[in-house]
């Protein structure tokens, strides 16, 4: 059964346009509630309860109310966590033995966008089959439960404290962060009240930025997708490290004291090296089609098998589970460590990196000695929705020309975004000028063919 609304990371779009409208989201809550209620009736018969968390977008209030109404109409109880990182909702759903978790967020997108994503009772993203079942319920009449069966709602007042303690529990008890000055950039997003406390309570001198959300400034010039603000703050405050989260805190970027930026590919290598040092062996790690070729070569040199998944943390997770491995990442900063959490968690990932540095007594640059990333040029080309870029002879010719020129010492990757009408053009080469030239040629061909 196909899916009309769910993409690679839930349902996402511009607020006010279908499907991110209050009436659709109310029906979505009802549909999800009916699926959950059906599962509960078939198991224990107990009334299901869901947790709803959100980031700091002004539209979150409206969508939260709509979801709550939909779940209530389906006879499902609701717990409201307020602003809460996506991985925090996943953790709390599992820890509180709830039926599901729901996050209202568009992650790294601007405030005009929003989205809805679901977690199952075990803190994992819903399988495709369940998402398709929810979509099927969207076409059915909304039949409100009787008054004695309506769902009830309440606030989870200690949600932030519970999640803070969980994050701290993933850091080795033998270490602390005393003596470290850290800049923590929360992107004016969901972690603004949580992340600074985690690092402070572990002993760090914390300089928080991006912690003044107003409903409209999430990801605006701050956070993991705009790391220049972090670089400036690290240098200005003579900090040891900087950590930037995105709007829902499921990804991160790290900056060292010199202002050097480390992406998810590099951090994956650091974590694998640390795991080898502590466990003796790592069978394999998972990246994506976008992972830098230099990291793949470096991991193989360490005797670690490397597998590329499709782009999207859910696909990295699928490959890890299939193989029974622990570590995976995307260059964008989604890092998975399945012995710590069921999903990508920017705060927990930062703590894993800090623990690796503590154990080794080395800097990030030193741990990456000998690993020089191939230059990559990524261009996001906005297209008309539904544009047939795959059938364009001119685009195919530009791709073929680049692949022929880079044969043996570079890569070309073209993929459509799963969350917006954008074609991502990535070219990797040994020389930055070659990567840029070929990427721009392909991007120009895409613009001409799809405009």
Curated annotation (Swiss-Prot):
Binding site for Mg(2+): 107, 246, 248, 250
EC number of the protein: 5.4.2.10
Pfam families: PGM_PMM_I, PGM_PMM_II, PGM_PMM_III, PGM_PMM_IV
Keyword terms, alphabetized: Isomerase, Magnesium, Metal-binding, Phosphoprotein
GO molecular function, one term: magnesium ion binding
InterPro entries in the record: A-D-PHexomutase_a/b/a-I, A-D-PHexomutase_a/b/a-I/II/III, A-D-PHexomutase_a/b/a-II, A-D-PHexomutase_a/b/a-III, A-D-PHexomutase_C, A-D-PHexomutase_C_sf, A-D-PHexomutase_CS, Alpha-D-phosphohexomutase_SF
Cellular component terms (Gene Ontology): cytosol
Swiss-Prot/TrEMBL cofactor(s): Mg(2+)
Annotated positions of the Phosphoserine modification: 107
Top enzyme category: isomerase
PROSITE patterns listed in its UniProt record: PGM_PMM (PS00710)
Keyword NADP: no
HAMAP family, A to Z: GlmM_B
Protein's UniProt name: Phosphoglucosamine mutase
Organism listed in the record: Burkholderia vietnamiensis (strain G4 / LMG 22486)
């Amino acid at each position: 059964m196909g899916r009309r609304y769910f993409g690679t990371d839930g349902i996402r779009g511009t607020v006010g346009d279908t499907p991110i409208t209050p009436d659709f989201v109310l029906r979505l809550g009802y549909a999800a509630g009916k699926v959950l209620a059906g599962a509960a009736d078939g198991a224990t018969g107990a009334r299901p309860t869901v947790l709803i968390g959100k980031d700091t977008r002004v539209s979150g209030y409206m969508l939260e109310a709509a979801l709550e109404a939909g779940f209530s109409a389906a006879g499902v109880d609701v717990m409201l966590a307020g602003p809460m990182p996506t991985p925090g909702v996943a953790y709390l759903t599992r820890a509180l033995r709830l039926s599901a978790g729901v996050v209202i967020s568009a992650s790294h997108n601007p405030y005009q966008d929003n989205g809805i994503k679901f977690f199952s009772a075990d803190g994992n993203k819903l399988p495709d089959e369940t998402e398709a079942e929810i979509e099927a319920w969207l076409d059915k009449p909304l039949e409100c439960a009787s008054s004695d069966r309506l769902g009830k709602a309440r606030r989870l007042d200690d949600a932030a404290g519970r999640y803070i303690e969980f994050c701290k529990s993933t850091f080795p008890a033998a270490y602390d962060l005393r003596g470290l000055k850290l800049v923590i950039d929360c992107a004016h997003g969901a972690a603004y009240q949580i992340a600074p406390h985690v690092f402070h309570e572990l002993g760090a001198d914390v300089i928080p930025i991006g912690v003044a959300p107003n409903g409209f400034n999430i990801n605006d010039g701050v956070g993991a997708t705009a790391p220049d603000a972090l670089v400036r703050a690290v240098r200005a405050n003579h900090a040891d490290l900087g950590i930037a989260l995105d709007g829902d805190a499921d990804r991160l970027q790290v900056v060292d004291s010199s202002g050097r930026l480390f992406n998810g590919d590099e951090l994956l290598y650091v974590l694998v090296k640390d795991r080898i040092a502590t466990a003796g062996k790592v069978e394999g790690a998972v990246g994506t089609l976008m992972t830098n070729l230099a990291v793949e070569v470096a991991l193989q040199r360490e005797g670690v098998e490397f597998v590329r998944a499709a782009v999207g943390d859910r696909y990295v997770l699928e490959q890890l589970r299939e193989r029974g491995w622990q570590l995976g990442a995307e260059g964008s900063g989604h890092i998975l460590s399945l012995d710590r959490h069921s999903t990508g968690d920017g705060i927990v990932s930062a703590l894993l990196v800090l623990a690796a540095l503590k154990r080794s007594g080395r800097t990030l640059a030193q741990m990456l000695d000998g690993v020089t990333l191939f230059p990559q040029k990524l261009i996001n080309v906005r297209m008309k929705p539904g544009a047939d870029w795959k059938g364009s002879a001119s685009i195919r010719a530009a791709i073929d020309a680049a692949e022929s020129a880079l044969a043996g010492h570079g890569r070309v990757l073209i993929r459509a975004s799963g969350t917006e009408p954008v074609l991502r053009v990535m070219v990797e080469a040994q020389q930055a000028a070659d990567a840029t030239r070929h990427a721009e040629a392909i991007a120009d061909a895409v613009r001409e063919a799809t405009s």
